[in-house]
């Protein structure tokens, strides 16, 4: 039996706006579902997704998201199709007990994606493999306390690029 490869889960946040974005970078951001400033997606860090992240490096910041932060994002910023809030009742309808259970299952690699575009049939007594009708992005506020620099990378004192587990602090400031 072939073992399943579990890739890390990354939160990707777009920090720079639209007007001067080159066409190829805009297409990459569109594939990542980052169409506006201060939107976040949660992706599986497979090699092809990491290639897209590296290409859009100067417009985004990213890092490993933990289960507690993801549960808080789902609770406070999760939206369903039709711009309705994600509720505990919706999760329970699809076999999930709590926001924390979904977040832990995603971060641990039990499920490969958070959102399904349409209804997925759940087997009797089992939970759905994702959250049906959940929008694949989260709209966040600008960070409390502001940003350092949108021209420098995180490693040299700015805000762009890879920031590792410190992305969780930024997300909490943006909720």
From Swiss-Prot:
One MF term in GO for this entry? structural constituent of ribosome
Cellular component per GO, a single term: cytosolic large ribosomal subunit
Pfam families per UniProt? Ribosomal_L30 (PF00327)
Q: InterPro entries recorded for this chain?
A: Ribo_uL30_ferredoxin-like_sf, Ribosomal_uL30, Ribosomal_uL30_arc, Ribosomal_uL30_euk_arc, Ribosomal_uL30_ferredoxin-like
The organism's superkingdom is given as: Archaea
Q: Which UniProt keywords apply?
A: Ribonucleoprotein, Ribosomal protein
Q: Name one GO biological process term.
A: maturation of LSU-rRNA from tricistronic rRNA transcript (SSU-rRNA, 5.8S rRNA, LSU-rRNA)
Family to which this protein belongs: Belongs to the universal ribosomal protein uL30 family.
**HAMAP family xref list:** Ribosomal_uL30_A (MF_01371_A)
Q: How does it assemble?
A: Part of the 50S ribosomal subunit.
Designated name of the protein: Large ribosomal subunit protein uL30
Q: Which organism is it from?
A: Pyrobaculum neutrophilum (strain DSM 2338 / JCM 9278 / NBRC 100436 / V24Sta)
Report the gene name. rpl30
